[in-house]
Amino acid sequence: MSASAVGQGRNVVVIGTQWGDEGKGKIVDWLTDHAKGVVRFQGGHNAGHTLIIGGKKTILRLIPSGIMREGTVCYIGNGVVLSPEALFREIEELETAGLEVQKRLRISEAATLILPYHVAIDKAREARRGAAKIGTTGRGIGPAYEDKVARRALRVQDLFDPQQFAERLRENLDFHNFMLTQYLGAEAVDYQQTLDDALAFAPRLAPMVADVSAELYAVNAAGGNLMFEGAQGTLLDVDHGTYPFVTSSNCVAGAAAAGAGVGPGRLSYILGITKAYCTRVGAGPFPSELYDNDNPARQDQVGVRLANVGKEFGSVTGRPRRTGWLDAAALKRSVQINGVSGLCLTKLDVLDGLESIKLCVGYTLDGKTVDILPRGSDAVARCEPVYEEFPGWNESTFGVKAWDALPEAARVYLKRVEEVVGIPIDMISTGPDRDETILLRHPYLA
């Protein structure tokens, strides 16, 4: 029996099925009309969600995209690593734009804090790795998660016990400063400055701190719908991605339950977001890659065109994204891991005007043909893509709002994607604005 059948609201999880940057922010914003609240459950301010509303561009890094909808309550769950400095910088940007933020934002008391020493370690490690760097954003996300797993992290609730916070901070800094100075060859982080700055955030945070898990339960019990907004993408998941070229958190749908404190049985529908092609930022294997700005051997002109037409630059880092054909074999892996109910395909219009379009449906790996992305980055790096080729279309799909209005060649391509991955495409995004969307099946009504 569904959650809605027993009087509870429906919960939709929106996750990326690629290497991030799939266009989740717009889709979350589009669906927020049907949700009482929007929840971030993992990651930190290392991923930007870009929204274009009424022609105005807004980039959100930490606060859920639902903040752009008046009256929607936004939640930051216990699975998020929180930089108070980044949070208030983002709040100020939004409030300057005329949005009411602090009265609509709830922050889990159990969220882990990102503090200056996490940032220092992140940057020092990448500098030490040199050419072998992973490509982190340098914002302290990974080191903060390390502290959480090591059970030494300072959490939001610790800010409200200054004496205990000071004692634990000193212990942490003794450890991290030793690592910074003796191993990484970097400068130590000042204890007193870190303490003073952190405690200064406490009174500003206090009105927003809540038992998020209990509040989410209450919203559902009253019949309210919730949306869980994933950051990054499945192929960057710390367990299921192309390890070690991954982020430091679980980006899969199952993380919504643990990272927000809700029962997994209350997740009603999983919406997987995928571009009509693939992109990746930073290092790591990418079987269907065509273009990499930093690699002279990867300068295919179709890939260059995808990057330029798709404006493929990181919204947080500004780094050029690597581009390639849609990898349906990798998408199939993501669909299985997440239990995806339906797909939303974004940026279809970027393919307009191509003479032909290729779809990766499998790989040749060590002399064998496989139809799903293998586990482990070494195996993925050895994969040679197996493509199916489709005729392109010259008609514009930009802003199209109905399936039947799409060019026949586009419909054929999309139907083949459905066949390969084994689930339906329920939504198609044909432009950055809210209304540039084709709806085939509504996640809250499915």
Curated annotation (Swiss-Prot):
Binding annotation for substrate: 315-321
Organism in which the protein naturally occurs: Cupriavidus pinatubonensis (strain JMP 134 / LMG 1197) (Cupriavidus necator (strain JMP 134))
Similarity remark: Belongs to the adenylosuccinate synthetase family.
Compartments it resides in: Cytoplasm
Record bears the keyword Magnesium: yes
SUPFAM superfamilies: P-loop containing nucleoside triphosphate hydrolases
Transmembrane segments: none
Function recorded in the entry: Plays an important role in the de novo pathway of purine nucleotide biosynthesis. Catalyzes the first committed step in the biosynthesis of AMP from IMP.
One cellular component (GO) term of this entry: cytoplasm
HAMAP family, per database record: Adenylosucc_synth
Residues reported to bind GTP: 20-26, 48-50, 321, 347-349, 429-431
EC number(s) on file: 6.3.4.4
Chain residues that bind Mg(2+): 21, 48
Cofactor comment: Binds 1 Mg(2+) ion per subunit.
Pfam families attached to this UniProt entry: Adenylsucc_synt (PF00709)
Residues that, per the record, bind IMP: 21-24, 46-49, 137, 151, 232, 247, 319
Catalytic activity: IMP + L-aspartate + GTP = N(6)-(1,2-dicarboxyethyl)-AMP + GDP + phosphate + 2 H(+)
Protein name: Adenylosuccinate synthetase 1
Organism taxonomic ancestry: Bacteria, Pseudomonadati, Pseudomonadota, Betaproteobacteria, Burkholderiales
Catalytic-site annotation from UniProt: 21, 49
Cofactor(s), by name: Mg(2+)
Subunit structure: Homodimer.
